[in-house]
Design a protein with these regions (language model features):
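Alpha-helical support elements that line or immediately flank enzyme active sites
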Residues: 53, 57-63, 129-142
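Extended glycan-interaction surfaces of carbohydrate-active proteins
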Residues: 1-125, 147-164
Length: 167
């Protein structure tokens, strides 16, 4: 079970022996240390960890996991990934939210960050935010879901950024 009581974690499973891994998989993105790979989400709280549940709802398939876990996970995403203001937010990647804007980060590490974490965790991307927001709306977390959507619309209001080119 990957649910830690607040959200679903990414369990990093390494091969028993390096030679058990295809050579082509050992070339890039943290694969130099196969038994301790870099750039993994690990115990991070990922904004779109429930994308499968979102699609299951859209398709009328019902719940894939315990409904209480879904609701708790979405509350955790709001708690840990929501950021109001990016003035003091370090992001060495692409910045799709700046200044006094608000957004949901791709990932957060409330239980401790690995030395070399998932490289995009400090970024914001609307597609992932919408997935979380719609999940919140499906689960009756209307205020949080609508706030996430309002944050996006505020960033892409036609003055600061094009409303036809959300990143």
């Amino acid at each position: 079970n990957l649910f830690n009581g607040e959200y679903y974690e990414h369990e990093v499973r390494t091969p028993r022996r390096t030679r058990d891994m295809a050579p082509s998989l050992r070339l890039h993105m943290g694969a130099a240390k196969v038994m301790q790979p870099d750039y993994q989400l690990g115990n991070g709280c990922l904004v779109d960890q429930l994308v499968g549940q979102f699609m299951a709802h859209v398709c009328g398939l019902g719940y894939l996991v315990k409904p209480s876990h879904v609701r708790r996970t979405l509350r955790s995403i709001t708690k840990y990934n929501r950021r109001d203001g990016f003035i003091d937010h370090f992001n060495c990647m692409r910045s799709y939210a700046m200044g006094d804007e608000s957004a949901l980060l791709l990932a957060s590490y409330p239980r401790g960050r690995p030395d070399n974490p998932f490289p995009y965790f400090t970024e914001v991307m609307t597609g992932f935010e919408y997935t979380a927001a719609i999940g919140m709306l499906y689960e009756g977390q209307d205020a949080a879901g609508l706030r996430a959507i309002d944050d996006i619309r505020s960033r892409y209001d036609g003055a600061k950024r094009s409303p036809f080119d959300e990143a």
